[in-house]
């Protein structure tokens, strides 16, 4: 074999390995394209909430450093996904609050199981994040949502605690003395309950689709819908 032939063979092998790597990354979800992820998600029963509820406020905290890990574990432009039936219920809650001069801001919706594991490792001692050994969070099936109350200008209203903070005061049963906070909690709870959600007792911001409380949906891994996992350093 001549030197030119060997050089050509090496180039061919390198190109083949590169293409195989790209294909593997796409299949495992490490190459992120929000539109493509939304299409794959739809095939598994998930929809982008922004398309179902135009104008709803979304601030996915795990796509920023403002979370218990201190790092973004979702990619930028992460779609805000829920099961289609759950998203329709959320649309009802938004309409109920809109009629009162308020609305919702979503902090988390569908959560890849890969991210759930990272959250448990970072904040497991707080009791906020279910261990995978004990079962998966309903977020991982797209049937749970974390959210808060905003006014018509999109300003967050006073609530018992910040997101993912101070579980000793984060109960759905507010015991503080601030009447405004109490009213805000009750307003949010009433709208979500009327729309078909059940609230997690320990977190005022967490609501589960009541239809699936005793009928959990299959978890959907991020790689299955081309959403890459970004582990904290």
Indicate residue ranges for each PLM-predicted region.
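Short, well-ordered surface patches within globular domains
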Residues: 115-116
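Extracytoplasmic cell-surface/polysaccharide-interacting catalytic and binding patches
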Residues: 22-107, 121-202, 208-233
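Compositionally biased, intrinsically disordered low-complexity regions used as flexible
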Residues: 1-2, 105
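Bacterial N-terminal signal peptides that target proteins for export
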Residues: 2-11
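Segments that shape or occlude catalytic/ligand-binding pockets
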Residues: 112
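Bacterial N-terminal signal peptides
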Residues: 10-20
């Amino acid at each position: 074999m001549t030197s030119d032939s060997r050089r050509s063979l090496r180039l061919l092998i390198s190109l083949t390995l590169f293409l195989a790597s790209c294909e593997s990354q796409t299949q495992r979800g490490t190459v992120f394209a929000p539109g493509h992820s939304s299409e794959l998600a739809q095939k598994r029963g998930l929809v982008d909430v922004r398309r179902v509820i135009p104008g709803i406020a979304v601030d996915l905290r795990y796509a920023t450093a403002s979370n218990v890990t201190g790092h973004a574990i979702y990619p930028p432009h992460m779609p805000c996904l829920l099961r289609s039936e759950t998203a329709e219920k959320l649309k009802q809650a938004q309409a109920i609050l809109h009629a009162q001069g308020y609305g919702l801001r979503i902090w988390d919706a569908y959560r890849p199981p890969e991210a759930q594991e990272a959250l448990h490792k970072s904040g497991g001692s707080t009791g906020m994040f279910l261990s995978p050994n004990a079962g998966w969070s309903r977020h991982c099936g797209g049937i749970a949502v974390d959210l808060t109350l905003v006014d018509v200008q999109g300003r967050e209203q006073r609530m018992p605690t910040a997101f993912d903070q101070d579980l000793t005061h984060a109960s759905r049963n507010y015991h503080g003395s601030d009447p405004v906070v109490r009213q805000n909690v009750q307003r949010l709870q009433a709208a979500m309950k009327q729309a078909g959600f059940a609230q997690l007792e320990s977190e005022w911001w967490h609501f589960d689709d009541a239809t699936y409380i005793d009928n959990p949906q299959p978890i959907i891994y991020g790689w299955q819908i081309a959403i890459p996992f970004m582990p904290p350093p």
